[in-house]
Swiss-Prot record:
UniProt xrefs under NCBIfam families: PRK09284.1, PRK13352.1, thiC
Disordered as annotated region, ranges: 492-511
Source taxon at top rank: Bacteria
Gene Ontology molecular function, alphabetical: 4 iron, 4 sulfur cluster binding; carbon-carbon lyase activity; zinc ion binding
Cofactor dependency: [4Fe-4S] cluster
Gene name as annotated: thiC
Biological role: Catalyzes the synthesis of the hydroxymethylpyrimidine phosphate (HMP-P) moiety of thiamine from aminoimidazole ribotide (AIR) in a radical S-adenosyl-L-methionine (SAM)-dependent reaction.
Keywords: 4Fe-4S, Iron, Iron-sulfur, Lyase, Metal-binding, S-adenosyl-L-methionine, Thiamine biosynthesis, Zinc
Protein name from the UniProt record: Phosphomethylpyrimidine synthase
Pathway assigned in UniProt: Cofactor biosynthesis; thiamine diphosphate biosynthesis
Native species: Leptospira borgpetersenii serovar Hardjo-bovis (strain L550)
Amino acid sequence: MESTQEFQVPLKTIRLTDGTEYQSYHTEGSLSDKKPSDYKNGIPKIRKEWIRTRLDRGDTNHSQMYYAKKGIITEEMRYVALRENMNPEFVRLEIACGRAILPSNRNHPELEPMIIGRNFLVKINANIGNSALGSSIEEEVEKLHWAVKWGADTVMDLSTGKNIHETREWILRNSPVPIGTVPIYQALEKVKGKAGNLNIQVFLDTLEERAEQGVDYFTIHAGVLLRYIPFTANRVTGIVSRGGSILAKWCLAHHKENFLYTHFDEIIKVMKKYGVSFSLGDGLRPGSIADANDKAQFGELETLGELTKRAWEEDIQVMIEGPGHVPMHLIKENVDLQMKLCQEAPFYTLGPLVTDIAPGYDHITSAIGAAMIGWFGMAMLCYVTPKEHLGLPDKEDVKQGVIAYKIAAHAADLAKGHPGAIKRDNLLSKARFEFRWEDQFALSLDPETAKSFHDETLPQDRMKTAHFCSMCGPHFCSMNLTQELRKFAQEKGMEEKSEVTICNRKKESGK
């Protein structure tokens, strides 16, 4: 743990057999010591005193953007600066200009602050939540624990089944990471599933209920406007967002503009009161690569840019949700247009999936797009599991989705040249070349799987120091042969001779 006088920032320390130590970003935090039997008690409220000071002072806007614009570096900002190895003033400036957000509801004191922005580490979100057809409260909290264990930076509770309020309460009291939700789901439940009966008061009541519990960011589909809906008529897959389809149905039923758009200022008031961040939803995102980058998608994106400005005028943090299903050659256009229309507000994308032909493997089809869009400047990736399009994910699906997206996020960090991103790669490569098998496992994103694959054929302890694996055996390992070659060259003075030969050739060629 790295500490200041006021708080400790969670870090995972990996101790290698050569004496080297590597410290990595750690999302599990205080939840790592929890057992399922302890979930009712929740985790420590590390922000309790910070929040109390602001309440005692009479603050009415609890958004981190509000404080950042005033030149105040909050405890949350300093916490984030430690986690990211950044200067606290740089963190404040990125939040103040809207290029990054620090989701942190004042009623989520258990939160261990993190930041989402293209100039920071690429983050990943994991979705959990029950449906009408399965999953208990305990199972959802266990999914939360499982997701952050493997590296989820935020978690969205998308529950649509029974006990939504209680499920969310358990999740929040046990979450060290920001929790996001989609309030329109519960609002629809309150009107017995009839979209036409929705209204702004039902929605605001739902919003207040969730904000009071401590939800850190809301997906609000306020950009689904009446005039954009006809653009989806000739799509291959129509409207694939649940929230988008609900609001499109309401608009057509009443032939009126989306009530979330017309009452956006009232929604802002709730966000301001609790410090909740907007995740402006892409209700018209493409659900197939054939529909990518069409009028409906980009029309909505333009409206999200307008709404971003309105939220910023009230010092409310905003990130923008994005697609979806986009072939590789169209991905960069999405990022460039989003940055232009939304003034560089953080981009938060679902993949995108780069092909539609792989049900059961969409964690792979989407991780390809995720790595690319992360490289181009996206700030947070929403994971996709192998069950995407097929069913409700279980624990193993959650793990597979998180790991696939940790790989994509790290690949993007490497491509962007994020300070320190390559250190872990170099340590693992060195351990691999030196046949330090235990260190290779420890430095892996998934040590358990790496070790189990190795031990399937070479389980003996002595094989943890062997200079080969089952792929090549003892006589054909290229790295072992390279080591022998280097040793031979060193003994025969070949390095010096090689340098002399190169110098002579350069002289002969006149270089």
